[in-house]
């Protein structure tokens, strides 16, 4: 029956939208704003990825520019993928909601070497205060 199939598609779309909205809300609520801003976020979009409801985030981070996909799997964990062109890298397949910001940040912005990232940030801060004088 055609109306039943259309209703199923609509319900699936609604579910994907709700999951994507929940992921976004959790990310924004639990990740410091300065960290979110460092990712250079351009857009959020609800999507299906590997037949899982997901949030696609367009980012311009220090270590990754492209898309981050956060998908909710059947075990109620998030799977995090980095996508650049046709290349896909699975960052982690078992991420709890409260770890999401840290997992994404390590993958796209700060990396695993805290001292190196702190040095980079300090250099960037100093660059903001340098005045260039031209003759």
Model-predicted segments: where are they?
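Single conserved hydrophobic/aromatic residue that forms the stacking wall/gate
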Residues: 1-13
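Detector for intrinsically disordered, low-structure N-terminal pre-sequences
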Residues: 8, 15-18, 69
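Hydrophobic, Leu/Ile/Phe/Ala-enriched alpha-helical segments that form helix-helix packing faces
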Residues: 7, 27, 31, 104-111
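Negatively charged, low-complexity tracts enriched in Asp/Glu with abundant Ser/Thr
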Residues: 15-62
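Mixed-charge, Lys/Arg-enriched low-complexity segments
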Residues: 15, 87-135
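Intrinsically disordered, low-complexity regulatory segments enriched in Ser/Thr/Pro
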Residues: 64-95
């Amino acid at each position: 029956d055609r109306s039943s199939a259309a209703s199923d598609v609509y319900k699936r779309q609604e579910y994907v939208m709700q999951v994507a909205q929940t992921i976004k809300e959790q990310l924004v609520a639990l990740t410091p704003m300065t960290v979110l801003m460092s990712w250079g976020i351009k857009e959020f979009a609800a999507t299906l990825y590997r037949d899982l409801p997901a949030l696609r985030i367009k980012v311009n981070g220090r270590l990754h520019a492209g898309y981050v996909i956060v998908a909710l799997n059947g075990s109620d964990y998030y799977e995090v993928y980095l996508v650049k062109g046709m290349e896909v890298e699975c960052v982690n397949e078992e991420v709890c909601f409260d770890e999401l910001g840290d997992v994404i940040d390590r993958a796209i912005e700060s990396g695993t070497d805290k001292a190196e990232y702190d040095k980079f940030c300090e250099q960037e801060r100093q660059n903001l205060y340098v005045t260039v004088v031209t003759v």
